[in-house]
Regions:
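C-terminal binding/interaction regions
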Residues: 3, 7-28, 33-41, 46-128
Length: 128
């Protein structure tokens, strides 16, 4: 890894210290799963502010790339995501948020943003 000391890399991969590795835009990938079913609900991005807000409140916050600002999932709909657990990948550049959703997760009203399956070149609905 360019710019990362060997000790930092070893600590990041095998240590116990949380050392989030944000990309060049200051973001981490966050995969949200349902705490009960483990179904994938959505994928979003977190910056340091969103990560801090999530950890402080227990509610999922993300960075809106289109609006360039912090947003709490469900802030207008009431369909918040209560975070039960945060899993960190080996490089500490991606997270899994295990959440209890307070309603549909997708802005379309679907329980999950992953409500279609690719079959050839056609999207087919899946039961979510």
């Amino acid at each position: 890894l360019k710019g990362v000391a060997v000790n930092d890399q070893a600590e990041r991969e095998a240590g116990t210290r949380f050392m989030p590795k944000f990309d060049d835009k200051g973001l981490l990938c966050a995969v949200v799963v349902d705490h009960a079913s483990r179904a994938v609900l959505m994928v979003a991005f977190m910056d340091a502010e969103a990560l801090a807000a999530t950890r402080a409140t227990g509610l999922a916050h993300f960075h809106s790339r289109s609006r360039g600002k912090l947003w709490q999932k469900g802030e207008s709909s009431g369909h918040v995501l209560e975070v039960e657990e945060i899993l960190v990948d080996c490089d500490q550049d991606a997270l899994v948020l295990s959440c209890r959703p307070a309603g549909p997760t997708c802005h379309t009203g679907a329980p999950s943003c992953f409500y279609r399956r690719l079959e050839g070149d056609v999207l087919q609905p899946v039961k979510t």
